[in-house]
C-alpha cells in the first residue's frame, strides 16, 4: 500500500469512528467489547472486559442500546440481563464453536440421564442451555463457585471439557463433563510451544484454561483473560508465550509496552490462531447496526426468565 493510500485509509477509519461515536451519543448506545475483538474495536469501546466483567456491565448501565462486540452467546447474556434494552450484535453470524458443541436438545437428554446432578454451565453456551442450568460460571470464577456448592451434590459441568478438567483439579470436586471444546484453544501446537520455550530462555507461558491438558502442564500461569492481564502486569518476566486468542495481546501491550508477547502457532504452523467468529465484527458493521438498529438479539421471554436465574445466581455468588 502506498503512503497516499495509507493516509486515505487512516482518514476513512477516523471518519468512521467519528460517525460511530456521534450516533452512539444520539442513540444513547454503549459499545461493549470482549478482549478478543480487533484492536480498532477495542479502542472505540466504552467498556472492554472478559465474560464476567461484560455480564456485570450489561446488567448495570444507563444506555438504551447495547452494541455487543463479541459473539452471539455474549449478546444473548446481555439481553437476558437487560431484557428491556435493545441489544445489537454487529454480525449476527458471530457464533461460537463451543456453544455449537452443546445443542440444547442433546443437553436436555444428558441432564435427564443424570437427574440427581447440580448443573453448572460455562457462560459460553446458548440461552437455551443456560435456561436448563442451576448456575452459570465464567473462567474467572468457575473454581471459586464450584467450591461453594455443597459437597453432597453431584455436579454436571458443561460445555468445555478442558476448562472442566482444570476446574476439577483446582476445586477438588468430581465433575461429570460435557465433551465440548473451543476450536481456538484446541489448535495450539505443543511442538511449536516447546520450540519457543527453548528459543526464549527465561520467558513464561501463560494460558487460558480452555487449552488442552498437554499445553496447560507446560504453562507457568493459567487463568481467564482478565487474570492473564493482571499476571503480566505484576510479573517481572520480560517475555511471554500467549496461549489464548491473540486479541488479548493488544491490551497486554498497552499495559506493558516494554514486554514481549509471542503468539503461539497452531498445529499447522500459522501464527493466525484467531477466533474466526470474534473477528467477524468490524467498524463498518458497527456503524451499519447503529444506522439500521439491527441485527438485534430476540429471545423467548420464557427463556429469558429461566436463564436469568442461574446468571443472577453467579453474579450474586461472585460478589
Predicted stretch roles:
Residues 1-242, 249, 253-319:
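Active-site loop-to-helix "anion-binding N-cap" substructures in soluble metabolic enzymes
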Amino acid at each position: 500500500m502506498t503512503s497516499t493510500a495509507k493516509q486515505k485509509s487512516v482518514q476513512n477509519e477516523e471518519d468512521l469512528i467519528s460517525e460511530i461515536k456521534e450516533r452512539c451519543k444520539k442513540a444513547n448506545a454503549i459499545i461493549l467489547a470482549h478482549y478478543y475483538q480487533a484492536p480498532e474495536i477495542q479502542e472505540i469501546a466504552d467498556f472492554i472486559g472478559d465474560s464476567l466483567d461484560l455480564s456485570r456491565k450489561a446488567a448495570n448501565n444507563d444506555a438504551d442500546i447495547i452494541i455487543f462486540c463479541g459473539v452471539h452467546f455474549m449478546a444473548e447474556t446481555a439481553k437476558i440481563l437487560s431484557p428491556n434494552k435493545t441489544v445489537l450484535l454487529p454480525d449476527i453470524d458471530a457464533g461460537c464453536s463451543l456453544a455449537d458443541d452443546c445443542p440444547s436438545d442433546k443437553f436436555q437428554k444428558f441432564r435427564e440421564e443424570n437427574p440427581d446432578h447440580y448443573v453448572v454451565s460455562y457462560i459460553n453456551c446458548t440461552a437455551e442451555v443456560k435456561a436448563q442450568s442451576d448456575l452459570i460460571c465464567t473462567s474467572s470464577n468457575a473454581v471459586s463457585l464450584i467450591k461453594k456448592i455443597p459437597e453432597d451434590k453431584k455436579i454436571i459441568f458443561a460445555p468445555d471439557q478442558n476448562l472442566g478438567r482444570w476446574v476439577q483439579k483446582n476445586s477438588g470436586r468430581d465433575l461429570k463433563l460435557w465433551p465440548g471444546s473451543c476450536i481456538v484453544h484446541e489448535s495450539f501446537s505443543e511442538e511449536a510451544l516447546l520450540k519457543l520455550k527453548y528459543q526464549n530462555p527465561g520467558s513464561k507461558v501463560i494460558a487460558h484454561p480452555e487449552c488442552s491438558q498437554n499445553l496447560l502442564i507446560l504453562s507457568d500461569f493459567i487463568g481467564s483473560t482478565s487474570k492473564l492481564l493482571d499476571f503480566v502486569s505484576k510479573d517481572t518476566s520480560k517475555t511471554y508465550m500467549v496461549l489464548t486468542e491473540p486479541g488479548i495481546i493488544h491490551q497486554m501491550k498497552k499495559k506493558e509496552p516494554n514486554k514481549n508477547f509471542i503468539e503461539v502457532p497452531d498445529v499447522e504452523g500459522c501464527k493466525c490462531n484467531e477466533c474466526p467468529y470474534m473477528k467477524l465484527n468490524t467498524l463498518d458493521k458497527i456503524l451499519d447496526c447503529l444506522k439500521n438498529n439491527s441485527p438485534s438479539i430476540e429471545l423467548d421471554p420464557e427463556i429469558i426468565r429461566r436463564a436469568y436465574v442461574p446468571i443472577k445466581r453467579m453474579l450474586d455468588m461472585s460478589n
